[in-house]
Amino acid sequence: MPQPSFMAPGALVRAAASAFVLAAASSAVLAQGTAYVSSEKDNALTMIDLATLAVKGTIPTCKRARHIQLTPERQIMVACTDSNQADLIDPASGKSVRRIALGDEPEAFDLSPDGKVIYVSNEDAGEASFIDTASGKKLRSVKVGAEPEGVKVSADGKTLYVTSEVASLVHVIDTATGKVVKNIKAGKRPRRMAITPDGKELWITNELGASVSIVSTATHEVIDTLKFEVKGARAEDITPVGIQMTSDGKRAFVGLGRANHVAFIDVASRKVGSLVLVGKRAWNVTLDKAQARLYVVNGLSDDVTVVDVAGAKAIKSVPVGRVPYGLVIVE
């Protein structure tokens, strides 16, 4: 008969302490930091504590806060469409430190890798503007298709991609010359983009095409199209917009708009693995640093759905400002 094994009291204490530390460390991965959510109607950012998943305050900003992004200096930059400005906010103090003119109707932007240039889509003018971050001066404007929105810069900073919603095009712009070098025919009403970490593919969400166009960055040709289906949802309600990839490039997450779901996609096979029910009009999506939780901004239910990535399950809905648009995380 096997003899029972016993752990010495000291070893038992050490094991328990070790388990506690590991559990605390695991929890800390999820618990540190703050999510900042822009709101189109409240002219403010809502702050969500990542430890408690509770709202801990708001920060006033300029009018109709939309696209939001971290600068290389870890400041928060938010485009305010009705103020024609970017608001630069210091997360440590929670205060605006500077406002930068972005031209008429700025909706989305991206930053050069060094943060020295802001590339912004000006919807009414049908232009992409290059803004010097330090001086706030416009360096140039590039004429693009009607209603430009999504803006994405390549990792080397040499190529700028801008979507045109009306023309169903993605314009490929040389950042050194400001010249449009190619127009890519995407799906209907292209909105946002993600570049795979290896730089080889550009993924474009097509809001009215219920799809993602996949483009080779070597040839700037569409090489595949991923179509979405959601059981019980009308085809016209499947309106993909926000997209983000994991740092290893293996998975992509897409907010499916009025279908009220977020899609988990295997990048290699280009197949949807899971569909997670979230709030109304799932718009933009953001992963935390550990890539353990996905934060989904829901524009019509005025909340953020927190999704456990491993379990592909919504774990909490956090009420935020009216018509929330984008979200960044400072950890």
Could you tell me what each predicted segment is?
Residues P2-A17:
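Bacterial N-terminal signal peptides that target proteins for export
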Residues F6, G10, A24-E331:
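Predominantly soluble domains enriched in secretory-pathway, periplasmic, or organellar proteins
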Residues S18-A19, V29:
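Cleavable N-terminal signal peptides
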